[in-house]
């Protein structure tokens, strides 16, 4: 654990277990691998063992965005004028209680391993730029982005040549990535050839898709328990749901063009591929949800009909009674004019 000061702002950083706290951490930034303009640059550092870490943050005392209005109504959280939670962090050494630190912020930073292959994917699809994740539903101009990128990635290059090319044509901070770390990333998303003992690499869309399929399979096998699943769905639909969710979890790490290439993947019968059928999973889940919506609509109509029928106190069905109006027919006797009848003379006044 260490405390850094950048631009007058103190940061509490939880370091990896294998990192020596006595050493200085030199961090650098790279563009977000998803090429989403609304996302900040990612902050990285590489330790002496060649492991690459990303510095991420977590803030206590701040609810999720979807419950912001409810939290305000319940007075659950309190914020400053800058919309920061009014909280402090206490760091205490359990072995020595006199050794402690008070941190006037509820935000802590932690380190997680980062795969440089995702930044290489972002470089390959550097023309596929999106404003936010909502743009991923639109597949327009994806083909043009792939075409324009492929023109500049047709050559096989050595690791050192790729290192120089990335530094000069993508971002200058690529110079902070070691050749060994870059080599491990290139091996995951590139085709390779060997000549005179030297290995040459060329990033291709096919290799990128294969790399991402491996990530999807790994997420499906170790599906996060925090993500709700379909409880009453058939087993095959549950599996499709996991594949769809695992694919969508990669949105924050890959450009839109790479995402749409992944959506169209479907293994052939003779390939012997064990990767999930992404395309079929999306189609089957969508068809199931559509059918389920129709069934729910029919079920709702039946429920409304049952509610209209109702039950009486004895548990018997009480059918709705129609109000019947009985019409009384009145017999109207015809009036006889005076002096016209045959018996009128008998009752004649004298």
From Swiss-Prot:
Record key words, sorted: Nucleus
The keyword Nucleus belongs to this UniProt entry's keyword annotation? yes
The source's superkingdom equals: Eukaryota
Record's Gene Ontology CC terms?
nucleus; ribonuclease H2 complex
- Tell me which InterPro entries the record gives: RNase_H2_suB, RNase_H2_suB_wHTH, Rnh202_N
Q: Which GO terms describe its biological process?
A: mismatch repair; RNA catabolic process
Q: What is its main location?
A: nucleus
Q: Where is the composition biased (Polar residues)?
A: 134-151
Q: List the CDD domains hit by this protein, alphabetically.
A: RNase_H2-B
Pfam families referenced in this protein's UniProt entry, alphabetically: RNase_H2-Ydr279, Ydr279_N
Annotated compartments: Nucleus
Q: Where is this region: Disordered?
A: 134-153
The record's comment on protein family reads: Belongs to the RNase H2 subunit B family. Highly divergent.
What PANTHER family does the record tag this protein with? Answer: RIBONUCLEASE H2 SUBUNIT B
Its UniProt miscellaneous note says: Present with 2340 molecules/cell in log phase SD medium.
Function summary:
Non catalytic subunit of RNase H2, an endonuclease that specifically degrades the RNA of RNA:DNA hybrids. Participates in DNA replication, possibly by mediating the removal of lagging-strand Okazaki fragment RNA primers during DNA replication. Mediates the excision of single ribonucleotides from DNA:RNA duplexes.
Q: How does it assemble?
A: The RNase 2 complex is a heterotrimer composed of the catalytic subunit RNH201 and of the non-catalytic subunits RNH202 and RNH203.
Q: What is this protein called?
A: Ribonuclease H2 subunit B
Species of the source: Saccharomyces cerevisiae (strain ATCC 204508 / S288c) (Baker's yeast)
Gene name in the database record: RNH202
């Amino acid at each position: 654990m260490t405390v850094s000061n950048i631009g007058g702002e103190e940061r509490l950083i939880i370091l990896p277990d294998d990192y020596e706290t006595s050493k200085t951490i030199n961090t650098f930034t790279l563009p977000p691998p998803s090429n989403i303009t609304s996302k900040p640059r990612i902050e990285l550092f590489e330790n002496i063992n060649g492991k690459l870490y990303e510095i991420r943050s977590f803030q206590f005392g701040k609810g999720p965005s979807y419950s912001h209005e409810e939290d305000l109504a319940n007075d659950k959280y309190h914020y400053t004028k800058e919309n920061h939670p009014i909280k402090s962090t206490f760091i205490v050494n359990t072995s020595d209680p006199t050794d402690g630190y008070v941190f006037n912020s509820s935000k802590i930073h932690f380190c997680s391993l980062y795969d440089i292959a995702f930044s290489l994917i972002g470089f390959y699809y550097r023309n596929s730029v999106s404003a936010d994740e909502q743009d991923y539903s639109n597949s327009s101009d994806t083909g043009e982005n792939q075409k324009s990128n492929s023109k500049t990635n047709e050559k096989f290059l050595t690791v050192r040549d790729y290192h120089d090319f990335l530094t000069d044509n993508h971002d200058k901070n690529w110079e902070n990535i070691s050749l060994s770390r870059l080599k491990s990333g290139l091996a995951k998303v590139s085709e390779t050839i060997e000549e005179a003992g030297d290995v040459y690499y060329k990033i291709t869309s096919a290799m990128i898709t294969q790399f991402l399929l491996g990530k999807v399979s790994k997420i499906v096998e170790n599906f996060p328990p925090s993500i709700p699943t379909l409880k009453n769905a058939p087993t095959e639909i549950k599996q499709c749901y996991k594949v769809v969710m695992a694919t969508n979890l990669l949105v924050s790490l890959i450009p839109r063009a790479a995402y749409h290439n992944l959506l169209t993947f479907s293994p052939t019968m003779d390939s012997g591929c064990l990767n999930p059928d992404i395309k079929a999973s999306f189609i089957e889940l969508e068809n199931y949800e559509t059918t389920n919506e129709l069934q729910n609509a029919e079920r709702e109509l039946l429920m409304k009909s049952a509610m209209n029928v109702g039950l009486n106190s004895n548990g018997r069905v009480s059918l709705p009674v129609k109000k019947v109006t009985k019409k009384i027919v009145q017999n109207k006797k015809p009036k006889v004019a005076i002096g016209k009848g045959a018996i009128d003379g008998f009752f004649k006044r004298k």
